[in-house]
Amino acid sequence: MPEPLTERQRQILQFIKDEIRTKGYPPSVREIGEAIGLSSSSTVHGHMTRLEEKGYIRRDPTKPRAIEVLDGSHTQLKRTIAVPVVGRVTAGQPILAQESIEDHFPLPADFVRADESELFFLTVQGDSMIEAGILDGDYVLVHRQQHANNGDIVVALIEDEATVKRFFKEQDHIRLQPENRFMDPIIVPDCQILGKVVGLVRRMG
């Protein structure tokens, strides 16, 4: 039998479960405090530590929102991660700067093979990649990195605009090739690679 919970601990645990059910990912410490009426983050952390000691949750202190809810027999529920959805990408600004993040999108943790802190979603604009199956309005899952191999589909920054194209490094230039036979490639001396496309999410209807 797991140790009994105090009323405050029960409230916190229930809020975590509710957030995972409705959003697909756990709440932050700040969100827990606001929901339960605790202004001190250290107090919230203290309750979370007790929940962990009693076997109700498991946390990864190196990752934000990394809370796994356990049942009384320590059986782990399926964990999700919250991947940030980035809006406008601007030169000179970190991709995952707080002001760039528009939302978070939940993914099953076992779907992700890369370091989750290096992942972000970007909304595709236009039909330059339709022959690669990437459509206007899709969300591409991007692994943040500054290098690419020939043939990789990348997010590159050109004149302060992020573009999704297939990357080719040629003799004295970079060719960013659209996957649309009616569009011409972008030829530039060099470009900033923001990341490699590793997945895709599409809303139907």
Curated annotation (Swiss-Prot):
Swiss-Prot/TrEMBL GO biological process terms: DNA repair; DNA replication; negative regulation of DNA-templated transcription; proteolysis; SOS response
Any single Pfam family the record assigns to this protein: Peptidase_S24
InterPro entries: ArsR-like_HTH, LexA, LexA-like, LexA/Signal_pep-like_sf, LexA_DNA-bd_dom, LexA_repressor, Peptidase_S24_LexA, Peptidase_S24_S26A/B/C
GO terms, molecular function: DNA binding; serine-type endopeptidase activity
Known DNA-binding region: 29-49
Enzyme Commission no: 3.4.21.88
Xref: HAMAP family: LexA (MF_00015)
Protein name: LexA repressor
